[in-house]
Amino acid sequence: MIGFGVNMDGSSLKSWGSALLLGACSLGGCSEAPAPDTGALNAACKTELIVLGAGQDAGAPQIGNSQDSGWNDPALQLYPVSLGLVDHDRGKRYLFDTSPHVTAQLRLFDALTGREGKGVHLDGVFITHAHIGHYAGLMFFGREAAGARDLPVYVMPRMAAFLRENGPWGQLVELGNISIRDLSDRMAVDLSDALTVTPLQVPHRDEYSETVGYVITGADASALFVPDIDSWEEWQTEYAVSIVDMVTEVNYAFVDASFFDDHELVGRDMSEIPHPRVTETMALFAEAPADIRKRIHFIHYNHTNPVRDPASAETRTVLDAGFKIARRGDRVCLGS
């Protein structure tokens, strides 16, 4: 077990329901989203984590899929996975993963946190790995778009080398748009005296970089973010990390839900495709107390995953079993 000194006093925690914000950004452009109700936020929350996207790397609808129902139904449109972390007391904001939809996601982040004016208003970006939905949004911080200055980008060593040595990412470093900050496995980064981020290496396809998840620890609560992993068993055998122990130690766990089950991709041998299935993770925690099951928020679901649809039978199965499904606009409190 890995200890992070988590405060498990549930009475001090606050979370907000899954208010799905309609309006979406496809690869062809962004539709207008309704103005978020910023007045409904709990003013007592000083540090909060906001879901800015819950889909797999390409979001939904996906390119080349003209029959996708999401073209006509905003409720089925997905931004790729991304979390926003805001420290209201210190006026600091951070992103976890930068997708190709980062422009729309930052607009959402601004609206939900009351940020106005020009500029990206970010104090750091934490990247999990070098697959398109998780880092490709960095390109928008370059001179062709935002023209950011010295934006801290927190990455593991292989990922740092990949960004420095390959275009167009190397240009971001050379021009000072981003400033690479090296991470080490299980070594916490202090963002303040009440907010830390700890990377945890996980098994995954590592063509260009390592892959990590993060534990984000605030004054009152903590969250685990593991959007991509090959299997929970491999995490245990290769890195001696138990997903059961991790979920027990944190208050919120945003975990890989790429595929619902092994029948999802018709005509494909899904045994050749890693990622723990939603049904597998549910079975793993089936006998856990309700207080543990409700900490799990399934995220990073593929466009084929039926939990993408809030009205699907599979969504109801997940919710009835006591688990949660992350939706864009969800927010949880890490410190009051």
Predicted regions located by residue number:
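Cap/insert and terminal regions of metallo-dependent hydrolase folds
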Residues: 222, 230-331
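Short internal beta-strands
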Residues: 151-159, 254
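Bacterial N-terminal signal peptides that target proteins for export
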Residues: 6-17
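Core dinuclear metal-dependent hydrolase active-site scaffold
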Residues: 36-111, 115-117, 181-246, 330-336
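C-terminal motif of bacterial Sec signal peptides marking the signal peptidase cleavage site
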Residues: 27-29
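Active-site metal-binding motif and surrounding structural segment of the metallo-beta-lactamase
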Residues: 87-95, 99-154
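Residue-level marker for buried hydrophobic side chains located in beta-strands
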Residues: 94-96, 126, 223-225, 253, ...
